Amino acid sequence: MQKYDVKTFQGLILALQDYWAQQGCVIIQPLDMEVGAGTFHPQTFLKSIGPEPMSSAYVQPCRRPTDGRYGENPNRLQHYYQFQVVLKPSPDNIQELYLGSLAAVGIDTLTDEVRFVEDNWESPTLGAWGLGWEIWLNGMEVTQFTYFQQVGGIECSPVTGEITYGLERLAMYIQGVDSIYDLVWADGPLGRVTYGDVFHQNEVEQSTYNFEHANVEDLFAQFDKCEAESQKLIEANLPLPAYEQVMKASHAFNLLDARHAISVTERQRYILRVRALSKACAQSYYDKREALGFPLCKDK
């Protein structure tokens, strides 16, 4: 008998947290800032840099303003959830561990078709790339699997293994529904609550904001301010708050993109500006950890 009701969204999350905790991961809480992917969380981006080991898992709410569809598309959201697993150094049996996690949420890997489709990953704004695969479950992509080669322009040694589950997609498969809004979020003593009950109105209103009301002039000013603040903090040898300003600049850029306020040429220029900040934060973080003697390294 399963410990958690994986046919609910919250039960699926609890089962994944429990499984990865048993594999030795520290269960981290979500970052309290707008990010486009779980990789932006400092626990992935910064902790992948340098020799110090760290394995963690966490849920991360993600915002991608351009993906909003006013709550009318059953498969597209501007706000959704990823479950992120970061294993450093990447263990030799990482694929087996992943397949074990599928079994933990009730998926039979002998009868369900699980395919690893080569799909190398790159994040231009983070100066990061890695060798990887999309993982398809009976024809639906549910996970991205990446071995980080470089983060913030710094070579990864040791290599970090990242597993990113698309929670809504995985839940749709497990629950057998065709619309995200029909997913059962919880089914308890107070009754059944669906994903739509929790988030449909938010999708309608946030899509309206992202596409119609976000103040373009203010967003351009916000980007410039965050960029300047990040540069100042890097000079002050404060890479963590400097990186928070990078994430804020990145979200401002994403909103400008949703408002169609940036031309194709300008778009590349803004991406390069964020990338330069990311790389500066990464180098500053590495230098600071090195000055501390990489304290999380056990073998000295």
From Swiss-Prot:
GO terms for cellular component: cytosol. InterPro entries: aa-tRNA-synth_II/BPL/LPL, Gly-tRNA-synth_heterodimer, Gly-tRNA_ligase_asu. It is found in: Cytoplasm. It comes from the Bacteria. Gene3D superfamilies: Bira Bifunctional Protein, Domain 2, Class II aaRS and biotin synthetases, domain 2. Pfam families: tRNA-synt_2e. The keyword Aminoacyl-tRNA synthetase applies. Its EC number is 6.1.1.14. It is an enzyme of class 6 (ligase). It catalyses: tRNA(Gly) + glycine + ATP = glycyl-tRNA(Gly) + AMP + diphosphate. This is Glycine--tRNA ligase alpha subunit. The lineage of its organism: Bacteria, Pseudomonadati, Pseudomonadota, Gammaproteobacteria, Alteromonadales. The gene is glyQ.
